[in-house]
């Protein structure tokens, strides 16, 4: 009897196992063990999010030299060399890195650097003319087609990071302010007092903004600047600190920006900054940002590296060569430090999700041009800000009639909406 019970139990167990197997889907051995180990990107599967490698690079990058010692790197105008990227360089070559942030190219000489990162075309021309960078590119580097800077042969392209107006999307929406869709919108009554700008006289980022303003307004640059009511800060870091989403920017990013303060935020929802700021202000998912580059205000900028001496030190030459390689390009894209000049490596990274760059990575650097013209635009900016447009005047109103005297008058203070970020929010609450 006991034997019969045992046989019956075994038969039931086999039947149950067969039923479960028939109802259970098979799981591929290549499926990720934890499908939520990486943030899910809208429109992309969990598997792609967790396992995508971004493809292979297309640049025939040279092999960087190996060695020892420290390479001192000047980072211009918000350019980034994230810690994880620097560690990859050390692992590959043996050289270590020390970074010195500077706000503009005029400050590079004081940094006593071996190599400069983050130069745009105008910076490269200015640095070359001043003798701040070498007069030739290191021998173990590649100048990509379409990126050579006539007049600055030492400049070697490694990425792209346009300068734009970056909007705090949440603030603009909550306070019923329209996002600008053109440069002209920046001077509209409900927007013009919401902008923070790093000083173009000392900041490469601020200078690039003035160049784009001049390009879009032509001979009307002075009039346009007079119609603005911007906050002008001494450095890019100070401008980010005045941004309403400034406290959303990562400490890692701020540590490489002159004049920045961790956790600082202000009353200005629009700030002139590189596109990489949007990647640095990413939400917890990593797939969205508190900041949105306003594409109609952007000026295209290629990021260049240049050695400060010729011949370049072994460490400087090694870093410049390494930055063009697949590991470095992918690291820059993954961290959102820059859009890689090897555009295929941007796939499924912060750079592609948040920087707002579409199409080819290599484009004409729109900052390049006559240094004399640039100086003239900067002079126009300064003089226009010093003499803002006069307040509009109206003809004297006729004497009110008896009926008009009995009616309440409109408050003229309501004619101009929002002189500052805080005032703008208050006026909306009253509405």
Specify the residue positions occupied by each region the protein language model found:
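Short beta-strand->loop
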Residues: 133-143, 154-157, 184, 269-270, ...
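Extracellular/periplasmic juxtamembrane helices and adjacent flexible linkers that interface
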Residues: 23-46, 314, 322-431
């Amino acid at each position: 009897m006991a034997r019969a019970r045992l046989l019956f139990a075994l038969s039931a167990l086999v039947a149950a196992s067969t039923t479960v197997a028939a109802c259970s889907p098979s799981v591929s051995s290549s499926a990720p063990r934890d499908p939520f180990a990486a943030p899910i990107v809208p429109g992309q599967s969990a598997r792609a999010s967790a396992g995508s490698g971004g493809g292979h690079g297309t640049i025939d990058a040279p092999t960087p030299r190996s060695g020892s010692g420290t390479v001192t790197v000047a980072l211009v105008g918000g350019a980034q060399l994230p810690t994880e990227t620097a560690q990859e360089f050390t692992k590959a070559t043996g050289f270590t890195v020390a970074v010195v942030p500077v706000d503009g190219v005029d400050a590079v000489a004081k940094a006593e650097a071996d190599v400069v990162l983050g130069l745009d075309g105008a910076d490269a021309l200015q640095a070359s003319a001043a003798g701040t960078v070498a007069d030739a590119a290191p021998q173990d580097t590649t100048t990509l087609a379409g990126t050579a800077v006539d007049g600055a042969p030492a400049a070697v392209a490694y990425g792209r990071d346009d300068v734009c107006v970056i909007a705090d999307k949440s603030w603009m929406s909550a306070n019923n302010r329209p996002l600008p869709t053109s440069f002209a919108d920046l001077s509209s009554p409900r927007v013009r007092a919401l902008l923070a700008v790093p000083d173009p006289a000392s900041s490469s980022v601020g200078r690039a903004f003035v160049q784009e303003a001049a390009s879009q307004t032509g001979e009307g640059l002075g009039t346009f600047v007079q119609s603005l009511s911007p906050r002008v800060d001494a450095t890019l870091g100070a401008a980010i600190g005045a941004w309403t989403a400034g406290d959303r920017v990562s400490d890692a990013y701020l540590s490489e920006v002159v004049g920045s303060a961790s956790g600082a935020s202000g009353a200005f929802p629009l700030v002139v900054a590189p596109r990489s700021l949007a990647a640095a202000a990413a939400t917890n998912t990593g797939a969205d940002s508190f900041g949105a580059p306003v594409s109609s205000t952007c000026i295209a900028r290629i990021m260049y590296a240049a050695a400060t001496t010729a011949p370049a030190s072994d460490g400087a030459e090694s870093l410049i060569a390494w930055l063009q390689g697949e590991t470095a390009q992918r690291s820059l894209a993954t961290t959102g430090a820059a859009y890689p000049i090897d555009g295929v490596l941007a796939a499924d990274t912060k750079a592609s999700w948040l920087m707002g760059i579409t199409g080819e990575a290599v484009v004409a650097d729109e900052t390049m041009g006559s240094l004399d013209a640039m100086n003239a635009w900067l002079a126009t900016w300064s003089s226009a800000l010093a003499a803002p447009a006069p307040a509009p005047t109206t003809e004297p109103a006729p004497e009110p009639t008896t009926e008009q005297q009995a009616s309440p008058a409109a408050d003229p203070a309501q004619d101009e909406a929002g002189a500052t970020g805080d005032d703008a929010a208050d006026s909306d609450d009253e509405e």
